[in-house]
Structure formats: C-alpha cells, structure tokens
Amino acid sequence: MKGRAVRRCAWAAALTLVALIVWACRPLSPYQEELVRKGFPESYVDRLEDLHERHPNWIFEPLAVTDLTWKAVLDKECSPGWNLVVRSKWAPGVWKDKGYANYKPYYAKNAKAYDSGAWYQASRAAVAYFMDPRSFLNESDVFMFETLAFDARAQTRAVVERTLEGSFMHKATYDDTKRTFSELVCEVGQRLQVSPVFLAGRLKSEQGAGTVQAKGRIGDSLLSLATNAADRVKENRVWGGAFARDGAGTAAIVAAGAEVFNGYYNFFNIGACGTGLFEIRFNAFREAVSEETCRRYGGPWTTQAKAVAGGARKVKELYVDGGRHTRYLQKFSVSPQAGSKRWLQYMQNIAAPLQEARSTSKAYREAGLLDLPFTFVIPVYRDMPSAPSSDPADGDSVYSPSEL
C-alpha cells in the first residue's frame, strides 16, 4: 500500500510537470505576440490580452527599466519611511459590510509608526506586491498606469465630479464663490494640459473630508499643538524634527498667535512631510508662503483657488513632466526619463496609486467612457521574478486585486 501511494504521488508530480511544460510551450496568440514584440514579458500578456478583449481601444505600452534590476529597486523602496501602510480600522465600500479592511498583512514585522502614528512601515513582501505591475492588470486597478495628459473626450466635468465623490469638495463651492471645485479643477487641467481627473483624484487622496490645509486653519492647529503640554512630551508622535528637541519653533508659534498662520492653503499637501503632526502642518504652511511658491506658482496661497491652481502647476512640472506621467510612477519613480530626480516620489502612502486608480475607473465606468482609447504605460523591470509577486493578504484585503 505504501508503494502504491508513493507511485501515485510520483505520477501526480509527473503530470503536473507535463502540464507546466505544455503551458509554457503553448503558442502565443497574434495579440500576445504583438505585446511581446513591444517589449512585454510573457508573464504580462495573458492579463493584457484579457483587457484587450474587453476594451479593444485600450493601448498598452511597456516602460523598460533596463538600467536597474528588480532587486535594486526593491531594496531602495524598502528604505525606512519610503513606503507606509495606513493604521486604521476604517473600511471603504464592500469592506465596510465585512467590518474590516485588513491592512495588517502589509505591515513590516515590529513596524515603526510614522507621522502622527497613523502609518506603519510596509513589509518587503508588501512593497514587492505593490511595486509589481502584474499585481494590478485588471479592469479597475490598471488605471494606475493611465497616462495623465489632457483628453477632453474622457475628462469631462461629470467625471471629475464623480471622482471627487466622498470628499468635502464633491458638489461644493470654493472661496465663497458660486463656482464648484469640479469647475475649478477642469479649468486648471485644461490650462495646464494635464488630466483634471488625475488632479481631482489626487486632491481627494490628500484632503478627503477636509484638513486644516484645505480650510485655511493651519494656525489654529499649530497653536493648539504648541500650547498642549501633553503633546510636548519627548518622542510624542505629534511632534517631529527640531520641534521635538528644543521647542524653539513652538515658542515662536505661541508668541505670534494662530492668525499669523491662518488664511493659507496647501491642497496638494506639497512639502507637508515630517515625523509628527506639528512638523507636517508647519511645513505645509511654509510651502504655501515660500519664495519659490510666490515666484513660480502663484503664491502665497491665500485662497483655495490659488492653492489648487499653483499646486497643480507644481505637480505637473515636478512629476507629470518629470518622467512621472502615471499614478504608479509618482509612487515608484523608476522611469529613466526622471534623470537626477529619479527617486523623487510624491507620497509615502504605498496604496495611493491603487486608491486613485479605483476612484478613476469607477468615475469613467459610471460615465460610460471605459471604451475610449486610454493609453497605459506599464513598467517592465530587468531581472524581475518570472511570476507576479504574491499578495500578503492572500486576496482578503481592500488592497487585494479588484475588478470593477
């Protein structure tokens, strides 16, 4: 009996091997051959052909990352603080009904908390999963690779309004005018020749329900933090940088008063970084009034309109025009076109391209525009694994691959 069991296992293994060989040697379809000629590895072509069959007008172009290996990029992206996963119990969409979003599988072991304590370092497996383009070649998530040039056919005001849904800007007016944020974003996008749908998605990601940076109340927040003794405890995560060490900056804030810092806006959260809430918000204020902002980007940003228009121009110049012309490339800045600013990533939130892609594809779908000729630029790394990187949550997370 034992010998039979061994033989059965051997036969099963042999059949599996034969099946794998047959699959590997299967002939490619004409469209798959076209993709391979363009430069896509065979590990991409099945998923891309499936998308092509559903949307024949879609165009897929490879971005060859030939001067860096997959491992070299992964090592760099695993640097402390580069890729963070939210620490939250909030669950969007269908995950709200389940009662969880399951972010935990993406945390690094003994993960360090960042910023206000609401973010954890991503594990190496999580970085590999989010960095691997093959993880997201489906009808919804593929929009992280959409090019961000202006296209009046798809980027209508209705789509922009749908993209803003769930944020404080949805169907809302700005600066005590009767004009809506969607009107403003469309106007700015057309003027800059950059997708207003992309701009709307980025504004939603950065502001959501509305932060002090979007409401012109940065000073109130700074004064509150500066005068709260409990928040000034050494190593408290609401503090950061020099403010945590000597308090000199906080004394100046208290002496000046909140109104000195109120009335300034930073909708794209440009420069809003640091190791605590105080430092993050102070740096957001500093960007809004900086010499460069005033000289090149319509500053100081004393109105919501100025902050949206000026911030959008800076995003376009630094990112869209700087070799980062997809949502993916603004997180994983691997394009050779980026030159000396190759590693200049827009955000630390590892899931930002995925979140923006989903809100974008949803808006296009609801507007009946999914069959337009979108162009997707998808990175291909040198020496990347033969199979897609696995999802640390094994399909059971809001960050797992998702169709529309």
Identify the meaning behind each predicted range:
Residues 1-192, 197, 222-251, 309-404:
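Cell-wall glycan-active module
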Residues 168-172, 233, 240, 254, ...:
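Substrate-binding clefts and substrate-entry loops adjacent to catalytic sites
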Residues 178, 202, 300-306:
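Active-site metal-coordination segments of metallo-dependent hydrolases
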Residues 197-199, 211-216, 324:
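Short, solvent-exposed secondary-structure capping/transition elements
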Residues 198-204, 266-269:
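Structural recognition of the beta-strand scaffold that forms the well-ordered cores
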Residues 205, 216-220, 257:
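Short secondary-structure boundary/capping segments
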Residues 205-210, 272-278, 336-339, 381-387:
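Solvent-exposed loop/turn segments at secondary-structure junctions
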Residues 211-217, 222, 293-296:
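Catalytic cores of eukaryotic secretory-pathway lumenal/extracellular enzymes that build
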